Amino acid sequence: MEKKITGYTTVDISQWHRKEHFEAFQSVAQCTYNQTVQLDITAFLKTVKKNKHKFYPAFIHILARLMNAHPEFRMAMKDGELVIWDSVHPCYTVFHEQTETFSSLWSEYHDDFRQFLHIYSQDVACYGENLAYFPKGFIENMFFVSANPWVSFTSFDLNVANMDNFFAPVFTMGKYYTQGDKVLMPLAIQVHHAVCDGFHVGRMLNELQQYCDEWQGGA
């Protein structure tokens, strides 16, 4: 049986500093929002190639580090209560060329990149050819990463019905490209406004850029 880590802390909304914001964005102003950036991955890509790593799991690991560093990206509704997961794990798309479909596969997050890479590699080896939508099953404490490496974009919006209690961040990666002496990659993120404001997304994206600039290949 797969190990599932689902520890969490319950938020007392009545005492929460975001109480009014949460209630507003859960009722009259209910909304999610998307933001797309052109991430400079020049240094990151160079280090990935130098260390002969795979780009996809390396980038997923950086996103997972950031999601686990900030509580606003680990929130969910569970049994009618707002909770903060102790940890969240990346659920990422795996493309099946033969059927032109994809699967959503999750891997347990680990702080250490090499440990995570080992877990990721095992999961892909075990489930990567399985055509089911969720070949490994589903867990509650996930965030989502989707890859669209066939096209670059400057804007990307998800339109999902019934998002009132869906707080998990959703990332979409596009095709990276060269601009001058830089390599840029489109990256879109969707979050729920009830738990996450522009400040939080901005801080995370700035930290993401710093991680990409300084990444040392899991050393």
Swiss-Prot record:
- The residues responsible for catalysis, as annotated, are 193
- What's its catalytic activity? chloramphenicol + acetyl-CoA = chloramphenicol 3-acetate + CoA
> SUPFAM superfamilies recorded for this chain?
CoA-dependent acyltransferases
Question: Example GO biological process term?
Answer: response to antibiotic
Give one Pfam family. CAT
Point out the signal peptide segment: none
Q: How is it used?
A: This protein is used as a marker in many commonly used cloning vectors, such as pACYC184.
Reported EC number(s) for this entry are: 2.3.1.28
State the UniProt keywords alphabetically. Answer: Acyltransferase, Antibiotic resistance, Plasmid, Transferase, Transposable element
PROSITE patterns named in the record? CAT
What the entry lists under InterPro entries is as follows:
CAT-like_dom_sf (IPR023213), Chloramphenicol_AcTrfase_AS (IPR018372), Cmp_AcTrfase (IPR001707)
Q: Which molecular function GO terms apply here?
A: chloramphenicol O-acetyltransferase activity
Subunit: Homotrimer.
Entry function: This enzyme is an effector of chloramphenicol resistance in bacteria.
Give the free-text miscellaneous remark of the entry.
Answer: Transposon Tncam204 is derived from the R plasmid NR1.
Q: In which family does this protein belong, per the annotation? A: Belongs to the chloramphenicol acetyltransferase family.
Q: Which PANTHER family match?
A: CHLORAMPHENICOL ACETYLTRANSFERASE, SLR0299 PROTEIN
Its name, as the record gives it, is Chloramphenicol acetyltransferase
Which species does this protein come from?
A: Escherichia coli
Q: Gene that codes for this? A: cat
